[in-house]
C-alpha cells in the first residue's frame, strides 16, 4: 500500500536502525532531509538540512549509528523503520579490510582484494558501495572492479569495468563514472560466451593488478570486486576463476550457506571466506524490472539524468566506413576444425559482421584496437554507440553517439547482443 506524505513527516530513528522506502510509480518523487543527528545512505554521510531527491525505481535504506531525525515528503510504495539491519556486520568487514590495508601500507605491499559474491538480489553492489565509501572516508583510494555483465554498476551492461574511487558516492547518483577501464564482452550473462568471459576477466585483472603499483595509496587500498548473481554450475566456475585471476584474499558471501561451504572447500587456505546476512530491505526483482534497470543505465549513458543531462549526437555512417566485428564464431564440431584448433578457440575468434536490418537498436563498442591483428579481446573500449537506423538502399546506418561525427579514424566497432530502444523525447 502506497503512502503519500504531501506535507512531509518526521521519522525519529534510534541508534543502529534504518529507514527503508521504495518508489515504484513513474513520476513519483520523494524528498529526504536530515534534521538532526547523523545518518548515511550505503556508506555516504547525509548533510544536515540538505534535501535529497529520489525517483522511480529507488530502493533506499538510510542508516544511523547514533540516532537521527529525518523529514520525508512524497509518494512511496513502502516506508518503514527497521532495527534488523546487518550494517554493524558490514562495518566489521570494513574494519578487517582496514587492518589488511594498514599492514600493506607498512610493508609497501598490495592491499586487500575482496570479492562480494552471492545469488541475484541479495545486495552485492550495495555492499560494495558501502565498503568503498567507508574506505575513502578514512583516506583510502581503492579500485572498484565490476564483473556483473548483467546489470553493470560502472559501464553499461555487457561489459566488465574498473574505476578508481577517490571520494564517497553521491547520495542520489552513486559514484562518478569518470575514466573507467572497460572491456567488451557483448552478452548480458557470462553464459553467452564462457570462454570469452574468463578471457576478459583475466585481462582486466592483469591490467588492474599492474596499475596498483603506479600509486602507493591505491596499492595499499586494494580492490573491491562485484560479481554476477549466477552461482551454480558454470557460474560458480566463473567465481573461482575470478578469485584466482585477482588473487582474492577475502570473499564475502551474501545470504547463501551452500555457496559459502563450497568456497571454503575450493579456494586456497589463505583466503578468508565470510558468510554475511543480506539486508531485510533487499528487494527481489522480476525479469522485467532487471530489463528496465538495464535500459535505464543505457539511457543514462547517452542522455544523463535530470540533474546532469547529456545531449548525444546522431549521424550517418556508410557501410564502407563501418569496420564492424563480433567476438565468437558459430560453434563447429571438432571434426570440422583446422588441425590443432579446438572448438573453444572459435569462442574467441574475431569475425566480421555484415550490416543488415537486424543490426538496428544494437549497442556497438568502440575498441582501442585498430585492426583485427591487434589483441582485440585484450584491448579496452573508448565508449559506445547505438544503431538507430539501417538503410540498405543508401548503404548506411544512423548511430546515436556521445561524441559528434565522425567516428575516430581506424575505429573498430564490436557488436553486442544488448539493445537500446532510443525513444527519448
UniProtKB/Swiss-Prot annotation:
It is found in: Nucleus. Gene3D superfamilies: Clp1, DNA binding domain (2.60.120.1030), P-loop containing nucleotide triphosphate hydrolases (3.40.50.300), Pre-mRNA cleavage complex subunit Clp1, C-terminal domain (2.40.30.330). ATP binds at residues 18, 59, 121-126. One of its GO terms (cellular component) is mRNA cleavage factor complex. Its main location: nucleus. The keyword Ribosomal protein does not apply. The keyword Transport does not apply. GO terms for biological process: mRNA 3'-end processing; tRNA splicing, via endonucleolytic cleavage and ligation. It comes from the Eukaryota. One of its GO terms (molecular function) is ATP binding. Keywords: ATP-binding, mRNA processing, Nucleotide-binding, Nucleus. PANTHER family: CLEAVAGE/POLYADENYLATION FACTOR IA SUBUNIT CLP1P (PTHR12755), POLYRIBONUCLEOTIDE 5'-HYDROXYL-KINASE CLP1 (PTHR12755:SF6). Required for endonucleolytic cleavage during polyadenylation-dependent pre-mRNA 3'-end formation. This is Protein CLP1 homolog. It comes from Drosophila ananassae (Fruit fly).
Amino acid at each position: 500500500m502506497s503512502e503519500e506524505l504531501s506535507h512531509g513527516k518526521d521519522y525519529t530513528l534510534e541508534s543502529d536502525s534504518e529507514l527503508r522506502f521504495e518508489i515504484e510509480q513513474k513520476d513519483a518523487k520523494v524528498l529526504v532531509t536530515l534534521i538532526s543527528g547523523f545518518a548515511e545512505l550505503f556508506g555516504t554521510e547525509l548533510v544536515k538540512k540538505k534535501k535529497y531527491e529520489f525517483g522511480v525505481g529507488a530502493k533506499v535504506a538510510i542508516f544511523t549509528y547514533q540516532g537521527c531525525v529525518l523529514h520525508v515528503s512524497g509518494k512511496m510504495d513502502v516506508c518503514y523503520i527497521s532495527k534488523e539491519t546487518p550494517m554493524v556486520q558490514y562495518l566489521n568487514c570494513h574494519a578487517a579490510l582496514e587492518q589488511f590495508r594498514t599492514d600493506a601500507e607498512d610493508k609497501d605491499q598490495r592491499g586487500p582484494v575482496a570479492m562480494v559474491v552471492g545469488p541475484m538480489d541479495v545486495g552485492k553492489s550495495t555492499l560494495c558501495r558501502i565498503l568503498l565509501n567507508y574506505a575513502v572516508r578514512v583516506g583510502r583510494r581503492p579500485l572498484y572492479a565490476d564483473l556483473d555483465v548483467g546489470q553493470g554498476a560502472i559501464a553499461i551492461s555487457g561489459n566488465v569495468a574498473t574505476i578508481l574511487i577517490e571520494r564517497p558516492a553521491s547520495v542520489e547518483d552513486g559514484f562518478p563514472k569518470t575514466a573507467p577501464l572497460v572491456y567488451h564482452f557483448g552478452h548480458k550473462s557470462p553464459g553467452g560466451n564462457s570462454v570469452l568471459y574468463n578471457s576478459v576477466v583475466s585481462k582486466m585483472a592483469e591490467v588492474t593488478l599492474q596499475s596498483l603499483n603506479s600509486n602507493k595509496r591505491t596499492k595499499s587500498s586494494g580492490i573491491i570486486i562485484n560479481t554476477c548473481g549466477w552461482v551454480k554450475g558454470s557460474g560458480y566456475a566463473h567465481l573461482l576463476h575470478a578469485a584466482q585471476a585477482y588473487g582474492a584474499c577475502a570473499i564475502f558471501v551474501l545470504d547463501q550457506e551452500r555457496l559459502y561451504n563450497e568456497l571454503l572447500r575450493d579456494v586456497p587456505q589463505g583466503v578468508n571466506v565470510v558468510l554475511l546476512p543480506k539486508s531485510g530491505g533487499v528487494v527481489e526483482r522480476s525479469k522485467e524490472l532487471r530489463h528496465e534497470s538495464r535500459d535505464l543505465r543505457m539511457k543514462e549513458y547517452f542522455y544523463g539524468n535530470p540533474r546532469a543531462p547529456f545531449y548525444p549526437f546522431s549521424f550517418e555512417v556508410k557501410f564502407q566506413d563501418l569496420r564492424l566485428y563480433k567476438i565468437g564464431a558459430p560453434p563447429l564440431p571438432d571434426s570440422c576444425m583446422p588441425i590443432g584448433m579446438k572448438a573453444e578457440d572459435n569462442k574467441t575468434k574475431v569475425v566480421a559482421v555484415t550490416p543488415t536490418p537486424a543490426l538496428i537498436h544494437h549497442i556497438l563498442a568502440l575498441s582501442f584496437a585498430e585492426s583485427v591483428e591487434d589483441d582485440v579481446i585484450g584491448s579496452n573500449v573508448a565508449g559506445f554507440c547505438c544503431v538507430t537506423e539501417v538503410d540498405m538502399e543508401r548503404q548506411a546506418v544512423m548511430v546515436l553517439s556521445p561524441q559528434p561525427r565522425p567516428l575516430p579514424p581506424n575505429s573498430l566497432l564490436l557488436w553486442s547482443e544488448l539493445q537500446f530502444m532510443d525513444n527519448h523525447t
